């Protein structure tokens, strides 16, 4: 069985846990008690606070806030062979680096993909139909990640433009807020 880990215990982690095909998912959380209350009982969740356990996982989904990614990557064992899926959207404030650039500082040889909307965690949690992009320079990795995601209401598309995908993901909320403002003011689109 494939070993899947999700680092982070926020709403995006909950959303991911609902669309992953594995009956068992390990969640790395800072607050174990809070995480246990959040995740559904229909899957077998292992909620941990130790990064060392994750070194032998097949896939690690990084679903933490973008500004905390560097600190989290620093705690993951350097000998991990895991494939990474970056779900964090944003640009690191201190360095102006994309999340993939931060990841490759720590794990330059590991395969990685970017998972990015256009979607919102609440849509996925509610089971609403939505789509996402899996972006990787390695098309086989994109296909592999797609196969571990339930496709019924969470459709995946592929591309190899990791930079464009990350910029789009970082700008998504800004555009959504601006669009909401324009609509709210009756200014049209």
PLM features: what roles do these ranges have?
Residues 2, 23, 45, 82, ...:
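A structural micro-motif
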Residues 42, 68, 79, 102-111, ...:
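Internal alpha-helical scaffold of NAD(P)-dependent oxidoreductase catalytic cores
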Residues 1-49, 55, 59:
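NAD(P)+-binding Rossmann beta1-loop-alpha1 motif at the extreme N-terminus of oxidoreductases
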């Amino acid at each position: 069985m494939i070993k899947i880990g999700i680092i982070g215990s926020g709403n995006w982690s909950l959303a991911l846990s609902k669309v992953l095909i594995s009956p068992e998912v390990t969640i790395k959380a800072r607050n174990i008690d809070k995480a246990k209350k959040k995740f559904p009982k229909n899957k077998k969740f292992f909620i941990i606070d130790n990064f060392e356990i994750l070194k032998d996982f097949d896939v690690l989904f990084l679903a933490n806030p973008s500004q905390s990614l560097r600190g989290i990557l620093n705690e993951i064992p350097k000998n991990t062979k895991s494939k990474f899926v970056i779900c964090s959207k944003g640009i690191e404030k201190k360095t102006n680096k994309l999340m993939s650039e931060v990841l490759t500082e720590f794990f330059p040889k590991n395969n990685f993909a970017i998972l990015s909307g256009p979607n919102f965690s609440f849509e996925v949690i509610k089971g609403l139909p939505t789509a996402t992009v899996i972006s990787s320079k390695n098309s086989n990795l994109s296909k592999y990640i797609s196969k571990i995601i339930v496709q019924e209401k969470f459709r995946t598309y592929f591309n190899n433009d990791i930079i464009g995908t990350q910029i789009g993901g970082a700008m998504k909320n800004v555009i959504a807020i601006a669009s909401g403002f324009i609509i709210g003011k009756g200014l049209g689109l």
